A protein has these predicted regions:
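Bacterial N-terminal signal peptides that target proteins for export
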Residues: 1-9
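Charged, low-complexity intrinsically disordered terminal segments
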Residues: 20-116, 120-172, 178-510
Length: 510
């Protein structure tokens, strides 16, 4: 069969599958009755840490740099929960940390806590059975964002093609809010590799524990997604089998070397939270997020709200912008804006993954195709080394770092003029700019911004990253006295793959 004929047949099948889908195009959710809750242990605890007197500093923050911090504080919040837990993630892995956290959510539900979990569909990987088992609990409700109508095998991807403009838009937001009082937002998903627990790859990542006025906006964002027409109850997606609670048996507690035990009960949770709250900084902050459903899903040329906000903050910078992004891709218009800033004297430094530290060659290819242009437009580039010293500093466990375990960058942060910091789910690439929904916490505080700037600069040092330069029209990688004219610590096959992918018109989708 000729190639064009095969392509035509595929598209016809996709259209048929899309038209015969078993899911409605959207859900009209009934309005839920408002429930007023009294004070909780967390709200009483938070009240004890209110600022002395400030009309602007109404939000308290503490950065979560290590995987232990990120998992321990989430678990402490769950153990202390009394009324509600609202969770929104792009990925929730069915691994040690993912299963254990799920088991503690069930324990919270057993004591009467209302648990709501919102997950994107693209990475469910046929785990509807497990999620339906959790959803069967009377106090647990799980919804899936923007699911494919066909759930299994090759036909799933055909249905994806049949409704590409809608299904290509993914929910990348991340939040974890308990009793409407404390929340965790940032770059991490739920899974071993985000908590320094994986034996395959671990990520440098960053979240923020927040309390105060901005939590109301985070909660509003969650409800907007929860009630959106692209939000589907998980029991609509699976088969009609009885939910099997044995799917969440055999739960083990994750173990860290050289860190305290994770909080396993209310007493240790309260103790940890008191310690953490005492270390929080009161700041002026705002939480920005994209709307869940675009007015026109076919329009992929308009930047999302989070992209516009970050672009505005960049344009207002006078001295320096420090970027840290797992994926880094700018289009021609954005590059011209960076060039204008550079011409005005703004120093722009960006840290991203090297090919050797990136777990996705496809994503790296989009960056590699724009790398020369970025350097030419005044952006100083740094690429993370896979054996970065940052890993051991975070994990305190050499077995979780290279060469035994791969190490990559997943953080998404930026510092403007060492006075404003942004931490969130937004990668500085075209998918975050035009397609995904994202969320960011903007912190206006010089102490926090300076601390984050120093953390990013440390990651850019020669112990941790390669520095890139243009010489005679070619890109070179530098580390101390050494230099390379091709991507360090990579093979020809990887570079060939990347080069081939750069020829395809898929830059916006990576």
């Amino acid at each position: 069969m000729p190639v064009l004929q095969r392509i035509s047949l595929t598209l016809v099948l996709a259209a048929i599958l899309g038209g015969c889908s078993s899911l409605p195009e959207g859900i009209d959710h009934p309005a839920e009755p408002y429930t007023s809750y009294g004070p909780s242990t967390l709200s009483v605890l938070a009240d004890e840490y209110q600022p002395q007197a400030s009309e602007q500093a109404t939000t308290a923050v503490r950065l979560q740099e290590s995987g232990w911090d990120a998992l321990a504080q989430r678990l402490a919040l769950v153990e202390s929960a009394e009324h509600t837990i609202d969770i929104q993630y792009y990925i929730w892995n069915s691994d040690e940390s993912g299963r254990y956290l799920a088991s503690r959510l069930l324990a919270a539900a057993d004591r009467g806590v209302k648990v709501r979990v919102m997950l994107d569909d693209i990475n469910l990987n046929e785990r509807e059975g497990l999620l339906s088992a959790l959803d069967a609990h009377q106090n647990v409700e799980i919804r899936i964002f923007n699911p494919t109508p066909t759930r299994r095998g090759f036909s799933k991807w055909l249905s994806f093609l049949g409704d590409f403009s809608r299904l290509n838009r993914r929910m990348h937001n991340k939040s974890f809010t308990v009793d409407g009082t404390l929340s965790v937002v940032g770059g991490r998903n739920i899974g071993d590799e985000y908590f320094d627990l994986s034996d395959e790859i671990n990520f440098r990542d960053r979240d923020v524990l927040v309390m105060g006025s901005v939590v109301t906006t985070i909660q509003t964002s969650f409800i907007e997604y929860w009630d959106s027409r692209w939000s589907y109850p998980v029991d609509m997606l699976g088969d009609d089998e009885q939910p099997d609670l044995s799917k969440i048996d055999d739960i083990t507690v994750p173990q860290y070397k050289n860190y305290p035990e994770l909080p396993l009960d209310r007493e240790t949770a309260d103790s940890l939270l008191k310690e953490v709250l005492n270390e929080m900084t009161w700041v002026n902050a705002r939480f920005a997020y994209d709307r869940p459903v675009p007015v026109d899903s076919d329009n992929t040329d308009e930047p999302k709200a989070t992209a516009v906000l970050l672009g505005q903050l960049a344009s207002e910078s006078k001295q320096e912008i420090l970027l840290e992004s797992a994926y880094l891709v700018f289009d021609d218009g954005q590059l011209e804006e960076w060039q204008t800033l550079n011409n005005e004297g703004v120093e722009i430094k960006a840290l991203t993954n090297s090919m050797a530290s990136n777990d996705l060659v496809t994503n790296h290819s989009a960056y590699a195709g724009r790398r020369y242009d970025m350097l030419e437009h005044g952006i100083d580039l740094f690429e993370l080394k896979p054996d970065s010293k940052l890993c051991q500093a975070s994990t305190q466990d050499v077995s979780k770092c290279a060469p035994e375990t791969a190490y990559g960058l997943h953080a998404k942060s930026v510092v403007f003029d060492r006075s404003i910091a942004s931490i969130g789910s937004f990668n500085f690439n075209l998918r975050s700019t035009y397609l995904n929904t994202e969320s960011v916490l903007i912190i206006e505080n010089k102490a926090i911004a300076e601390m984050l700037a120093k953390t990013i600069e440390q990651a850019m040092s020669e112990d941790n990253s390669w520095r890139l330069e243009l010489e005679d029209g070619d890109v070179y990688w530098y580390s101390g006295d050494q230099n390379w004219d091709s991507e360090p610590e990579t093979g020809k096959w990887e570079r060939m793959q990347s080069g081939f992918l750069q020829l395809l018109p898929i830059e916006k989708y990576l």
